[in-house]
Amino acid sequence: MDFHNILVMASEQQGLNAVPKRYSLAVGPPKKVPKVKGVESAAVQAFLRRKEEEKRKKELEEKRKKERLLAKRIELKHDRKARAMASRTKDNFYGYNGIPVEEKPKKRRRTCENVSQAPEAEYATENEAEQLEFAQTESEYEQEEYDEKPSKAAVKPKAPPKSAPAPLNFADLLRLAEKKQYEPVEIKVVKKIEERPRTAEELREREYLERKNKRVETQKKKSEKEVKSAGISSSSKKATSLKECADAKLSRSAADKHAPPKSSLSSLSGTDKKPKAPALTEKHSRSFSSSKLSQMEKGKTSQNSSLKSPAAGSHSKLPANGMGKTGSSFPVPSSKPMANGAQRLPSAKESSLKKPVHTKPGNAAALQHETNSSAKRPSSSLGKGGSGHPAGGSSAGPGRSSSNSGTGPGRPGSVSSPGPGRQGSSSAAGPGRPSSSSSLGPGRLGSGSGVGPGRPGGSSSTGLGRPGGSSGTGPGRPGNSTNTAPGRLGSGMGTGPGRPGVGPSAGPGRPGSSSGTGPGRPGVSPSAGPGRPGLTAVKPRCTVVSETISSKNLVTRPSNGQINGMRSPPGHRPVFRPQGIGRPPVGYKRQIDDDDDDDEYDSEMDDFIEDEGEPQEEISKHIREIFGYDRKRYKDESDYALRYMESSWREQQKEEARSLRLGVQEDLEELRREEEELKRKRQSKKLRTR
C-alpha cells in the first residue's frame, strides 16, 4: 500500500473522532427490589439438585473405597496365612513327629480372626473416617458369615452317636471264662531293638540273612504250588520234603558258621583254629557229594555258595606256621596273611561277609558246573605220589583262590607235584581260578598255609631247569607271579607275610635283582633248615598308598595283565571281577609270553629305582619317621566301613572333648618346653658372663 493513500485515509478519519463522548455525573433515583413473600422455588430446587449431586458422588467414592479396602483385606489375609505357614514350617522343622496340627473349633477360630483383624484395620486405613467405615463394613461382613454358617449347619444333620455294646451278664462271663480257661494265651514278646548305629559288617550281614530267608521262602512257596497243582505222587512228595530238609540244614549251618567269625574275631589266637581244618574239608566233600544229586540241583547251588562263603571266612583264620601240623591246610583268600601265626587276621569276618554278596543266583549254573567238575576229577597238579588225593576244597565261589589241599596224612600244605621234569600248571583245578599249588623242584614242598615242618609259607618257585606254569602263592596273597626259566622268578613271585606281592624279584644277572639265589632255587621261602623258620627274604615294594589304604575288600585274583603275559605296573593291586564261566587254563601261554618279556632288555630302565629288596619293616619305619604314623596302633578299617561310618551325637561330643583335652595338654607341654629353653639360655648366659 502507498504511503500517500495512508495519509489521505488518516485525514478523513480525523474529522470523525473529534467529537468526545460525555457521561452525566448526576445520581439517578434508587432502584427498589420487589420483596416476595415465601421461598423462591427456583433457588431451592437448584440447591437441592446440588446437594443430591454431592451425595451421589460421596456414595460412589465410599463404594470404591470399600471395594479397595476389601481387596486389601483379602490380600492381607492371604499374606498372613502364607506368613503363618512359613513361620510354622520353620519353627516346627525339627521335632515334627508326623502328628497333624489340631484344628481349632470354628467359633474360636473366628474370634481369633476378629482380634487379629482389628489391628489390621488401623494398618490399612489412612484417617479416622476410613477407620470407622472399615469397622462397619467388617461387622457387616462378619454378620453375613454368621448367617451363612448356621444355614449350612442346618442342612447337615448330625449323625447319631454309636451306642456302646451291651455289657455281658455275669453268667455269660463265667461261661466265656470256662471256655477260654484251657486255651493258651499268646503273649507277644516285644523285641528290644538296640539303639546304636550298626557297623558296615553288621549291615551287610543283615542284608545277606534277609536275602537268604527270602530265597528259602520262595523255594518253599514254589514247592507248595507244585504239590497243589500236580496232585503229586508219593515219590515226588518225598523229594520235596528231602529238599526242604536239606535247605533247612544248610541254612542252619550257614547261620551257625556266621556266628564264630564275628564273636571270635579278636579273642581267639591262631593256634586255637587248628582242629577246624579237617572238619571243614569234610563239610566241603559232603557238599560236593550232595551236589551230584540231580533232583536238588537248582535249590542247592545258592545254598552251597552261602555255606562255602562263611567257611572261607573261617579258613582265613588258619595261621601260616606249619610247625608240627600235617593235616590238610588251606591257602587263605584274604589279602593280609600272617607270619608264623603270630598276627591275627582282622579281615576274616569281612571277607566272609563280602563273598556272599558276590555269589548271586545268576552264577548258580556256573557254580554247579565248577563243583561238579572239581568233585569228579582230581586236580591236574597232583604229582606221582599225590594222584590218589582228590582236591578237597578245590571248588570255591568266584573270586576265591582254590585250595588244592591234599587230605592224605603226610601231606602238609597244598598238593605239590614232586616229580622232576614236570610242568606243574595247576590252573586246570577249576576254570578261571588262580590255583594255589605250584610246580616244584625235587624234594620241595608246595606253597600253602603249612609248608613243611618249621617252614613258614612263602610261595615256592620253579623246579630245576623247567618253567613253572602257574604261581604258588602264599596264604591269601594274590598270585601275580608266573614262574619262568631257571634262575628267574616271575613277576611278584612270593611275598612276605605282609602284603600282596607285585614287585618282580629277579634271579641273578637281571636288572634290579635283589634276591637272586642259585638257579632255580626258590628266592621266596628260604627256610634255612628244618626246625628253623626263616622269614621270607623277598618282600614286596611298598607305597604309601598300600600302607595307609586297607586292601581288605579286594578279593584275590590275578589281573588281566598277568594273563596276557604283561607285567603289572608298580603299585598295581589285583582287581576282583566276578566271573560266570571260567577261562581255560593259560599256563603254557603265560610261560611263552613271559620268556619274550624277560629277554627284551630296556636301556631306559637302567636307572629306574626299584626298592623291592627292602623289607616291609624298614619301609614302615621310614613312614613312621616321616608321618609319625604307626600302623600297628590303628585298627584296620575297610573302605566300605569308612564310607558308611556312623556315629552318635554323644560319641562326637566325647571325641570333641578328648581332642580338646589333648590340645590343651600339648599347649601346656609346649609352654613348659619354652620355659625350659629360656632357663637354659639364661644359665648359659650366666656361665658366659662369669
Curated annotation (Swiss-Prot):
S-S bridge residues: none
Biased composition (Acidic residues): 593-617
Composition skew (Polar residues), residue ranges: 369-380, 545-565
Cellular compartments annotated: Nucleus, Nucleolus
Amino acid composition bias (Gly residues), ranges on this chain: 383-396, 443-457, 465-477, 489-521
InterPro entries: Chromatin_SPT2 (IPR013256), SPT2_N (IPR054552)
Start and end residues of each stretch annotated as Important for interaction with DNA: 1-579
Keyword Nucleotide-binding: no
Coiled-coil portions: 40-82, 650-690
Regions of compositional bias (Basic and acidic residues) in chain numbering: 186-228, 244-259, 271-285
Residue ranges of the region described as Disordered: 105-167, 186-619
UniProt keyword Transcription, yes or no: yes
Main location: nucleus
PANTHER family the record matches: PROTEIN SPT2 HOMOLOG (PTHR22691:SF8), YEAST SPT2-RELATED (PTHR22691)
The protein's role, per its UniProt record: Histone chaperone that stabilizes pre-existing histone tetramers and regulates replication-independent histone exchange on chromatin. Required for normal chromatin refolding in the coding region of transcribed genes, and for the suppression of spurious transcription. Binds DNA and histones and promotes nucleosome assembly (in vitro). Modulates RNA polymerase 1-mediated transcription. Required for optimal growth in the presence of the DNA damaging agents actinomycin D or mitomycin C (in vitro). Facilitates formation of tetrameric histone complexes containing histone H3 and H4.
Protein name per its UniProtKB record: Protein SPT2 homolog
